[in-house]
Every structure is written in C-alpha cells, then in structure tokens.
Amino acid sequence: MTAEKYTFPANYGEFDAVFREYRAIFEKQLRTVCDSFCDNGAKYRALYDAASYSLEAGGKRIRPVLAFEMCRVCGGDINDAVPAAVAVEMIHTFSLIHDDLPCMDDDDMRRGRPSCHKAHGEAVALLAGDALSAYAGKYICCLLYTSDAADD
C-alpha cells in the first residue's frame, strides 16, 4: 500500500461522519448478536441477559470503528470486518466485566449504570464475561471461514 491510496479525513467533520457511519453499522449488528443469544433457549437466559446488558451499555466503540477502518485502508469491504468488529468488542467487554468484579477492582458502576456483577450477581457476571470470550472466538471463526475464504 502506498501513501497515495489512503487519505486521512480532511477535517473533524469528515472524521465524525465516518465514525458515526461505522458506529451505526456496528450497533445494528450488535443488536442482532444480542438478540441471537436468546435463540439458545431459556436455560441460560440469565447469562445471556448479563452479557447483553454489558455489551449494550454503550461506550465510544472505538475498537470496532478501528476494525472497520483498518479493513477499508487495506482495500477490503467494511462489511467483511463486521465479525472482527463484534469479536473485538466482546473481548473488550469481557475484560471490563471481569475487571469490575469484587476480586479485582470491585467497581459498582460502569458506563453510568450498575456494573454487571451489581446488576446480575457476581457468579453470573463472571460467566457472562467468560461467555463473551468464547463468543468472540465464534465470530472470528465466522470471519475466517466464510464461503469466499474457502474458495481461495
């Protein structure tokens, strides 16, 4: 890649527009992912609720945005980066859930609301973080084993 192929946003307004576009793409996919947790049955409903609670708590979403932008800079279609963007946010959220636990920082609040262990209990929060770590691997596999990749 040469420097001529990639242009940085000319100004903050352009950067902000791209950032908002990427966040919108990500948030839509994240909603789908959180909804799909429920498809796994009622047996683990508390676990999925806790994972969704933490994933949907907001934040800047800089990691998924960077995944989209890295894909674009390398000449890819940003839609192909959606699984990676979801996975990286799951890993980040998993780390926040575990960091807030009483055995670590024991934080009561995260992103302006009760931390996962305060809202759902310590045991459920621990397992929700673990589940997000496992689900991140699943979404990376989606990225690696698409039908297009299999054809190469």
Where are the regions a protein language model picked out?
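Conserved N-terminal diphosphate/IPP-binding helix and adjacent helical/loop segment
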Residues: 1-84, 97, 104-105, 110-111
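Short alpha-helical functional segments enriched in proximate histidine and acidic residues
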Residues: 33, 93-94, 139
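Catalytic-loop motifs flanking and including active-site residues across diverse enzymes
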Residues: 62-63, 86-89, 128-133
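Long, hydrophobic/aromatic-enriched structural stretches that serve as scaffold segments
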Residues: 90, 96-98
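Divalent-cation-assisted or electrostatically stabilized phosphate/pyrophosphate-binding catalytic cores
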Residues: 107-131
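Histidine- and acidic-residue-rich, metal-dependent catalytic cores
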Residues: 131-144
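Conserved small/polar residues in nucleotide/adenosyl-binding loops
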Residues: 145-152
